[in-house]
Amino acid sequence: MKVLHLGPLWFPVSRDAAGGRETWLAGLIVALDKLGCRNTLLASGDSQTPAELVPVVPRNLVALMTDKLAGEALYYQEHQLTLALARAAEFDVIHSHLSPGVFSLSAVPSIGARVLHTQHTPVWQDFEWFIRQHPDLWLNTVSEFQARKLRAAGARRCFVVHNGIDVASFTFQPQGAGLAFLGRIEAGKGPDIAVAIARQLGLPLTLAGPVIDRELFAQKIEPHLGEQIRYIGVVNHAQKNELLGAAACALLPFRGAEGFGLVSIEAMACGTPVVALANGALPEVVEPGVTGYLAAREEELAALVLPALKLERAQIRQRVAARFDLSVVAGHYLKLYEQIGVANR
């Protein structure tokens, strides 16, 4: 099975990427490679992958824009689409991890019926409108939460494959101390809620992730930094592993409707229970009383932390390995690729 992957350009596709989608894709390609797939990746040239890498840009767009070497992402994305069109005939499946931007590939004669679009981000009304115009796209979402919306909009070929991680790359820790928050520092991710919970409970908190909303950071995070509450910036895989494994509980007070919530299973892989708002796909991921707890409202979160500390960390690790290890996820994708192949015979 020969697969052409279209990866995001914002960050390198790498296990140490700052973006969750890029981290996930790097792991998926490794797992598919073990199943015998021959993978080619269209992504930034600083990506790290066992796939044949076709550089769309020499470095990721965030780095290029920071250095004032790029300004408008659309031109680089158009170049990626052009490269995909030039190479598409060589592959059994063209797997796009982009949205929006390349749905037009599905309209190209001879290759369109072999294009799979994976929807990683939340489904908004504009995408629902688009699906009503194009209901026969091959789609997969990373949660039933997303799929329900697309099917309601008329999607006829919409499948669910949950996100996954290489569980073995995370170190199981039989115990932890304090709280951890990992995510973008912006209102939708709720880092300010995590700070408030830590202060209310008198527990130490370590926050990590890129600062997107500098005003929020300056007003609601920075004034509380000190011995109890620390901010350590953007973390790589090893640092993430250490952060999540050392915590007694991971706080994920996401205000927005998460398409999946990858950090939740990364924490669980370390044995760390999760306390989160029951938004988006998180009710599909967190098993209350087993791997963590979910709250309907922000004000209910703090009361769930102490019960979460009593959960069996070894069982948490076992559950995430059984449900979300990349070996399991890659198997689901391979079956979907084969289904696309059968439909095109």
What residue spans do the PLM features occupy?
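Catalytic cores of nucleotide-sugar-dependent glycosyltransferases that transfer UDP/GDP/TDP-activated
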Residues: 1-345
